Amino acid sequence: MREVISINVGQAGCQIANSCWELYCLEHGIQPDGYLTEERKAQDPDQGFSTFFSETGNGKHVPRAIYCDLEPNVVDEVRTGAYRNLFHPEMMITGKEDASNNYARGHYTVGKELIDGVLDKIRRVADNCAGLQGFLVFHSFGGGTGSGFGALLMERLSVDYGKKSKLEFCVYPAPQTATSVVEPYNSILTTHTTLEHSDCSFMVDNEAIYDICRRNLGLERPNYENLNRLIAQVVSSITASLRFDGSLNVDLNEFQTNLVPYPRIHFPLVAYSPVISAAKAAHEANSVQEMTMSCFEPNNQMVKCDPRHGKYMATCLLYRGDVVPNDAHAAVATLKTKRTIQFVDWCPTGFKLGICYQAPENVPNGDLAKVSRAVCMLSNTTAIAEAWSSLSLKFDLMHSKRAFVHWYVGEGMEEGEFSEAREDLAALERDYEEVATDSMGDEELEAEY
């Protein structure tokens, strides 16, 4: 079986993971203590558990997950929470002092002490897998542990597991709302370090998800749990075809093959539909056509950028539940007639479909309604460069005055690393611009010779 190991780094990574595992357990019929519910026992025994769970001799299902944070508070909540008996206690690794929003502490000083222990635990989980497919790494770009320790971990995973897929789910700093002043520094430093080590990075930004929760779920003041449960639905959709049957299955390597035209351009934009509250669910038709169209509206996308200003290179549509291939193909045919959805000229077809027959689950008493079908769209678009440019601007404003730089240098970082990281990001923005420019000219020139 193709197993996937989840590694959750820092506060954001660990809290998103809590929502994800809560959802996986509901989907697979696993109780908070790790044992199957009675009705699930009566069904087909092999229900695709083994991708995310390993089964012990006495029938307990243990997540293939590792929690690591440089300070204990967030992981302690898992250790004492409703799912404390689900996770292996040794797979929760915490330090004594946090990274204080400082990339250099997470990557160099404090992180260095913890990394070998974490890799040792990863090795133990990996040895338990028959055919390890890859890693999902959850972390934020703005925090100290998420950015610094996350980057260190990606570097070390590349050394130890070079051939395995490494997919990241990153919480990207929102354009308007910031949790710390030095987010632009941390984000650009971690992007620079992980650019060559990550195969595919799915970015979500808090502001975009706040807006989706406010608009679609009618929550005036969404909290992190509301946001994380929405992100969990996306992660579940992306991994559903690894766990359940479907007519068009997609595995981790296929994501890269279909979404990443060049190694550096690996930041797909994520959208999910329908996000709908229980109160409104009964009044909506929620047809395949409607769902598919709504994924292309900027309002439903999980990073603040406008895809109408960019061009698409590739798009994956992952359907779940009561969807027949015919409807999906019809929806895509309609999309292709739309003038607003522009593809780069060197990739005219650009749509990859996945269908998984397992209907989406919802958390009891949660905000999301129970729906019979859903779609998650992953699209590689040049518009995501907008997100980078707004971040670069903030970085430049601070770095021109060398503000806060001494905190990083004091933790053993070279000051030159800032300029190096900034140049790398400028190169990434240029890469996106080049991809968007029409490439027909070169071919015509070649044809003349």
Swiss-Prot record:
GO terms for cellular component: cytoplasm; microtubule. SUPFAM superfamilies: Tubulin C-terminal domain-like, Tubulin nucleotide-binding domain-like. GO terms for molecular function: GTP binding; hydrolase activity; metal ion binding; structural constituent of cytoskeleton. GTP binds at Q11, E71, S140, G144, T145, T179, N206, N228. The active site is at E254. InterPro entries: Alpha_tubulin, Tub_FtsZ_C, Tubulin, Tubulin/FtsZ-like_C, Tubulin/FtsZ_2-layer-sand-dom, Tubulin/FtsZ_GTPase_sf, Tubulin_C, Tubulin_CS. GO terms for biological process: microtubule-based process. Its cofactor is Mg(2+). The record marks Y449 as: Involved in polymerization. Tubulin is the major constituent of microtubules, a cylinder consisting of laterally associated linear protofilaments composed of alpha- and beta-tubulin heterodimers. Microtubules grow by the addition of GTP-tubulin dimers to the microtubule end, where a stabilizing cap forms. Below the cap, tubulin dimers are in GDP-bound state, owing to GTPase activity of alpha-tubulin. This is Tubulin alpha chain.
